[in-house]
Amino acid sequence: MSCPVIELAQQLIRRPSLSPDDAGCQALMIERLRAIGFTVEPMDFGDTQNFWAWRGHGETLAFAGHTDVVPAGDADRWINPPFEPTIRDGMLFGRGAADMKGSLAAMVVAAERFVAQYPNHRGRLAFLITSDEEASAKNGTVKVVETLMARNERLDYCLVGEPSSTEVVGDVVKNGRRGSLTCNLTIHGVQGHVAYPHLADNPVHRAAPMLAELVNIEWDKGNEFFPPTSMQIANVQSGTGSNNVIPGDMFVQFNFRFSTELTDEMIKSRVIALLEKYQLRYRLEWWLSGQPFLTGRGKLVDAVVNAIEHYNEIKPQLLTNGGTSDGRFIARMGAQVVELGPVNATIHKINECVNAADLQLLARMYQRVMEQLVA
């Protein structure tokens, strides 16, 4: 299939960019962007490659994404080697095809076509690309955003190319994401022999009533844009492995995906109050990986919806479900942020694939967003 979007996607897939290794993907993108007049600023931190690129001045529309991918798993189970892209029955197979090298290719080609048509565009078109999204995300977009904010860089709109669609490209646009807060809780007891419980203090028994109440809390009812806050216990560890030893400690890890109805401080306060209610001895560690954010109807959402309706003749759903994305960092800049990308049915799976025609359509949608906001 001869198509600049598909050809670039294949070139990116051939580079085995296991997070946080970029494997040359950004060099390929930078070469294409510089050729059409972009100024490119590499922003590497630690083992992570990032770049910020821009063309023009004024109101700024940035396209954001990541070049890194998750491991392929058992390569023998793929219909084709995972880093040797192939097209079968109109589907482009390869690790990263959907998440998210297909989107990156669509962004770059859309920019090339846009600049050719509007060489003197009125606004500023930008790219924020990282190689650290799938793993720790500590040296990627968050560090670039901190740098840009420190120098008062302008960012009005940001389109993240995460695979947002479910059945057909553009059927779902993510216009926000829930916050994510993890609690690492250790309940302290006194280790002892199971035959002499009066000489010990079993932390599992101590914690059980508290955990029962915790899992039954209704944190909120959600709102127009967000489902109710959820809390899930992810890990529980206790004991020595022996059947005659009362454990000395119990470790419980639980995660909150919370809406804009709550703050992380509200959640923390309620958990601590519950621990105090049951008079537990404990140690707490919190990890806030992202605050909730929401982009309401405005210029960016309207432009994205218009592009989808124009090219795919469907009205997209505006949703905030799913996991976190780098949009949570970009939203700190005060920008309107949405996510639009290909169908996500096979991301992180064996035989990850994307409809090749969808990538061509996505490039046209991206270009139309550019035309509406910075032409």
Curated annotation (Swiss-Prot):
Belongs to the peptidase M20A family. DapE subfamily. GO terms for molecular function: acetylornithine deacetylase activity; cobalt ion binding; succinyl-diaminopimelate desuccinylase activity; zinc ion binding. One of its GO terms (biological process) is diaminopimelate biosynthetic process. It comes from the Bacteria. Pathway: Amino-acid biosynthesis; L-lysine biosynthesis via DAP pathway; LL-2,6-diaminopimelate from (S)-tetrahydrodipicolinate (succinylase route): step 3/3. HAMAP family: DapE (MF_01690). Catalyzes the hydrolysis of N-succinyl-L,L-diaminopimelic acid (SDAP), forming succinate and LL-2,6-diaminopimelate (DAP), an intermediate involved in the bacterial biosynthesis of lysine and meso-diaminopimelic acid, an essential component of bacterial cell walls. Pfam families: M20_dimer, Peptidase_M20. The active site is at D68, E133 (proton acceptor). Its cofactor is Zn(2+); Co(2+). Gene3D superfamilies: 3.30.70.360, Zn peptidases. Zn(2+) 2 binds at D99, E134, H348. Homodimer. The gene is dapE. Its EC number is 3.5.1.18. The lineage of its organism: Bacteria, Pseudomonadati, Pseudomonadota, Gammaproteobacteria, Enterobacterales. Binds 2 Zn(2+) or Co(2+) ions per subunit. It catalyses: N-succinyl-(2S,6S)-2,6-diaminopimelate + H2O = (2S,6S)-2,6-diaminopimelate + succinate. This is Succinyl-diaminopimelate desuccinylase. PROSITE patterns: ARGE_DAPE_CPG2_1, ARGE_DAPE_CPG2_2. Zn(2+) 1 binds at H66, D99, E162. It is an enzyme of class 3 (hydrolase). Keywords: Amino-acid biosynthesis, Cobalt, Diaminopimelate biosynthesis, Hydrolase, Lysine biosynthesis, Metal-binding, Zinc.
